[in-house]
Amino acid sequence: MKKYQTHIILTIIFCMMAFAAHARRMSPRDAFSDSVMCLVFKYSQSVDTTGRAEHKSYAYTKFQIKTNKRNATLMLVPTMYAVAHGGGRRFISEFYNQMTLDANGRPVAKRLLNISTIPHRSNTLSSVLKYMTPTVYGETLFETNILSPFHYKNRRYYKYAVTQLPFGKAQVYVYPRLKNTQVIEARAIVDSQSGKISMVDFEGEYDMTRFYISIIMGKDGFGSLSPARCSMRANFSFMGNKITGMYTTVYGLPKILSDSLNNVADTALMAKVRPIELNQDEADIYKKFYEKRKQITDSLNNNTPEKNFAKDILWDVIGDNVLNRISQGFGKQNQGYFRISPILNPLYMGYSERKGIVYKFDLKGGYRFTENLELGLRFKGGYSMKQHRFYFNIPLTFNYNPKHNGYLKLEIGNGNRISNNRVARKMLGISKPEDNDFLYPLFSEYPGLSLPEISTDIDANNRKLTEFKDDYLRLTNHWSFNDYVGFEIGLVSHQRKAVIESFYKLFNYPSKYVSVAPAVALELLPWGKKGSIFKIDYEKGWKNLLGSNIDYERVEADAQTIFQASRRQSYSVRLGAGFYTRKGDHWDFVDYTNFHDDNIPGGWNDSWSGEFELLPSQWYNASDYYIRGNFTYEAPMIATAWLPLIGKYIEAERLYVSSLVVNHLHPYTEWGYGVTTRAITLGFFAAFKNTKFNGIGCRFGFELFRDW
C-alpha cells in the first residue's frame, strides 16, 4: 500500500487542479448568467418594504369566459352551474377591489363593485382569479401552489438561460428540470445591474387549468415586488368540457369610491373607475345581454309568464343548490354567512379500509354580532356504505373574546359503535379470566339458547349483538391567558345504548350506560400561537351525576407540531399518552378523547397525518392505557413526481410512520406512502403487530375542486 501512496496523492492533486482550471475557464456568458440570477434571487431582500403592510390600493379586473364545448358533467364543477345551464356561450364580468396585504404579505381583495352577464352574478372559475395576484419573488407563486423560479430555494427544480440585452437589460429563460404541475416555464426581462424584474411571462398547468400569464411589474420601491398589470389566458378542461377565460387586472389605482361599498352592481360607477376601455367584443357581449334583459322585462310587463316547473324549480333552484356549493352572506353589512357543500355531487366521497366508501357533506354558518361576538355552527356528516351507518358531528361555537381566544362550544354527535371492553378483548383474542364471568350465562336457565362464539373472526351481523350506539354531548369553555397558556373547563356526557338490548339482558347486564364527567384541560404553547401545542386533559365521571351510572377517571397528554420548511416541505409530529386512573364497578367502556377512530374521514389536509389507518377498531376500546406517536413528511416531489408520464400529475407526496403501545401490542406500527393529484388522493399502508407483518391496506379520496 505504501508504494502506491505517492501515486494516489499525486492523482488527487492533479484532479483538483483540473477542476480548478475548469472553474477558471468559465465562459463570460456563464459568468454573466450566474451574476444576473444571483441578483434576481436577492432583489426582494434589497427593497425597503417599510409601510407596505399598511399600504392600501385599488385594482380593476375584467374577464371574458367563452364556452367552447360543454356537456352535462359541467354542472358537477363548482361555480360552473350557471355557465353549464345558461343559454349563452360568452360572458363578461368586471370587478373593482380594494387591495391590502395579510400578515404573510399576500394580497387580500375586498370587492367593492361587481357587474356581470353571468346569471345571478355567480362567481365562475373563481379559483383562477388567484393566478392574477402572483408573488413573483416568493417561494410559491399562487398562495401555497406553484414553486416560483425566482426564489433562491427553488433553483434546484429549474434550469436558467440568460441573454444579454442592450441598455443594461437581460432576458431570462426558465425551464423546469422535470414535468410536474408544481413547476412552470417562464421568460423575464431583468435589470442586469439590480436584478429587478420589469416584465415576466409564466406558462403552466394546475388543477385542470392551463394558464398563460403576462405581467408588468411595478416600477419603484416595494411596488416593484408586485404586478402593476397582469393579463392571462386560462384554458379549463374537464370530461370533454372546454372553457376559455381571458383576464386582465390593473393594480395601483387611486381611491375614487367609498370603501363602504360591498359587491355593488352599478354600471355607472364601474364606468367611472374603469382604467381601460372595453374592446368591441366585450362591448357587444354587454349590448346583447342588456337587450335580452330588456326584452324579458317588456314581455313580463305585457304578459303573465307561465311557470316551467322543470326549468324554474328542478333546474334553476334544486339543480344549482344540490350539485354545487351554496355560499351566501346575509345581514345589512354581510354579518352572517352560510356555506353548504354539494349534496348530490358524486365527487365528495372517500374510501378507507374499515368504513369502505364514505359519502360526506359539510354545512357551515356564522353570524357576527359585534367585533368581539360571533356565533358559528357546523354540521359535518358522512354515510358509510360498508357499515350502513350515518355519522354526524355538530359543533355550535360562541366566540366572545378574540383577543384571549375565548369561546363557548357545544358539540353533539354520534360516535363510532363501541363494544363493551370485555367483548372487545375477546374479539381481539386477549381476554382476561374475569371476562368469562360476563361472557357465559347460565344456559340452564334458557333451554335451547344458542349464542354466537365471540372471537377474533366474529362476522358483522353477530358483532351487532355486542355493540353499543354512542351519542355524546360536550360543553367546553376555552380561554387563553396569553399567547403561551390556555385553559379549558367543561362537561362531557355519553349515552351508550345496546344495538340489541336483549343480548345484554341475558347476562343480567345493563343495556344502557350514561356517563357524565366534568373535564379540564391545560394548553401550553412554548413558542406562541404558531408553534407546538402541548395539552393535558383530565376527565372524571361521577356516578349518579345527572343520571350517570358509570364512574371513572382518565388522564391524557397530547403534543402536536407542524414545521413548515422551504419548497413546500412540512414535518408533522404528534405524540400522546393516556390512561385510566380509576375504574368503577361497571368499568365496561374504554373511550379516549385523543385516541379514537375518526368516523368521518377527511381529505388530504384533514387528519391523515395523525391517525392509524389499519388498526382494528376494537383496539381503541380494549386497553386501559396507550402511548402513540405519528410522524409525517410532505414535499411536492419525493419519488413519484420524478417518474416519466405519471410524475407531472403529482401535486404532493407524503411519508407516514405511526407507532402505538397498548396492552398486548408492544408495539403496533404503520408505514405509509401517499400522493395527491388533481383528481384523487391515494395512500398505501403496511401494518406490523409486535414487529410481525400484519397486512396492507389503502385509502383514497376524491380531491377534485378542493380549492374551488
Where do the language-model regions lie?
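Residues that define the transmembrane beta-barrel architecture of outer-membrane proteins
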Residues: 355-359, 388-392, 467-473, 510-518, ...
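Structured extracytoplasmic
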Residues: 23-169, 178-183, 247-350, 463-484, ...
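C-terminal outer-membrane beta-barrel translocator/porin domains of Gram-negative envelope proteins
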Residues: 407-413, 417, 423-427, 432-445, ...
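Short loop/turn motifs that connect adjacent beta-strands in outer-membrane beta-barrel proteins
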Residues: 326-340, 368-376, 401-409, 483-487, ...
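Gly/Pro-enriched, hydrophobic low-complexity segments
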Residues: 159-266
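Residues on the lipid-exposed face of transmembrane beta-strands in outer-membrane beta-barrel proteins
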Residues: 359-365, 394-398, 475-479, 491, ...
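Transmembrane beta-strand segments that form the barrel wall of outer-membrane beta-barrel proteins
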Residues: 197-204, 232, 339-351, 362, ...
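Outer-membrane beta-barrel transmembrane strands
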Residues: 353, 357, 365, 445-492, ...
